[in-house]
Amino acid sequence: RKHEKDFFARKETKYNESFHETAKKVHAHINELNKSLISEDLDGSQAKVLSDLVVQYNTTFQKLVALQLEIGLDAKSGLYGSLRNAVHGIEKLAKEADEYEILFHMLMLRRNEKDFMLRRDPKYMEKFNNNISNFENALATIQPEKLSQMQSSLNKYQADFKLLFAKESELGLD
């Protein structure tokens, strides 16, 4: 349990490896216990049940680790990194075109994203969707040569945020 908590608190894969090693040791101890019970002509069925629970716990934890890896361990990995790259693309294009209204709307979306990441509250998805509409309305005033790039980056950002929301929901929101 300690390695599990450390993995989610520190977001470092070494704790997943430690968890796996500890689970193997526990499983080996359970097998030894089962052999001892059998050698003493005692019922080893509870050791089998315990072994199955350890396997189930390990499997569930590995699924959660895979989910967290997909979400991201830091600002540059997983969906966190993808969101960051997409929004930086929009920011760069908006600055180059002196489109400060676009920057404003981008920052509002970023605010919704960060509020969701910090508070893990589904209400920020609704706020995000409202601000996407505002952003798209502001895009109507953009020069056509910049519009397709911004729209493409916005679509990527929106898709990644929706996927992040889904994955965080699967992981468990507060």
PLM region spans:
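Membrane-proximal N-terminal soluble sensing/regulatory segments of transmembrane proteins
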Residues: R1-T59, K63-D174
